[in-house]
Amino acid sequence: MIVIVDYGLGNISNVKRAIEHLGYEVVVSNTSKIIDQAETIILPGVGHFKDAMSEIKRLNLNAILAKNTDKKMIGICLGMQLMYEHSDEGDASGLGFIPGNISRIQTEYPVPHLGWNNLVSKHPMLNQDVYFVHSYQAPMSENVIAYAQYGADIPAIVQFNNYIGIQFHPEKSGTYGLQILRQAIQGGFIND
């Protein structure tokens, strides 16, 4: 079972619909009882990092997620950023599952990074356009599986142990986005 974590700030209905379209059983919850039963946990998100972490802590989801670190966790957009240690957006601590700091995009192009952009990767399936909406980015590191070029290299997919972060919106990226979401659910992008 796949559980989408509901902390009040997210693109939950679109993500749920996309996962159902792929044929998976999916439940939306913010309770330990349900999240503890998940095989895969999806952390969606749209909004401000500090506000999201405040809600996650208010709902005790940080503790619930911390006791489920043996499970695959997929963060989408803000959800990916929340898995990192810290963000400059609101100078807030994150969940700390992936090492690094989230920082504002530094580019001569307009911010937010909004619209379709091509993925760059050594992975054979990660080479098409996907839909981005964000002003902050993860650091370039050995955990980056794919990135987009937007006046600077912007991490688009990261994988660290059982954590997968997707900065763009696969649920808004058409059939190709759904293929990426399926690959993330099935095992990720390392050692294919």
Curated annotation (Swiss-Prot):
Pfam family, one: GATase
Keywords attached to this entry: Amino-acid biosynthesis, Cytoplasm, Glutamine amidotransferase, Histidine biosynthesis, Hydrolase, Lyase
Pathway annotation: Amino-acid biosynthesis; L-histidine biosynthesis; L-histidine from 5-phospho-alpha-D-ribose 1-diphosphate: step 5/9
Function: IGPS catalyzes the conversion of PRFAR and glutamine to IGP, AICAR and glutamate. The HisH subunit catalyzes the hydrolysis of glutamine to glutamate and ammonia as part of the synthesis of IGP and AICAR. The resulting ammonia molecule is channeled to the active site of HisF.
Gene: hisH
Protein name stated in the entry: Imidazole glycerol phosphate synthase subunit HisH
List of catalytic residues: C77, H169, E171
Intracellular or extracellular location(s): Cytoplasm
Chemical reaction(s) catalysed: 5-[(5-phospho-1-deoxy-D-ribulos-1-ylimino)methylamino]-1-(5-phospho-beta-D-ribosyl)imidazole-4-carboxamide + L-glutamine = D-erythro-1-(imidazol-4-yl)glycerol 3-phosphate + 5-amino-1-(5-phospho-beta-D-ribosyl)imidazole-4-carboxamide + L-glutamate + H(+); L-glutamine + H2O = L-glutamate + NH4(+)
Glutamine amidotransferase type-1 domain ranges (all copies): 1-192
GO molecular function: glutaminase activity; imidazoleglycerol-phosphate synthase activity; lyase activity
Domain of life of the organism encoding this protein: Bacteria
GO BP: L-histidine biosynthetic process
EC number(s) on file: 4.3.2.10, 3.5.1.2
Organism: Staphylococcus aureus (strain Mu50 / ATCC 700699)
Known partners and oligomeric status: Heterodimer of HisH and HisF.
Entry GO CC: cytoplasm
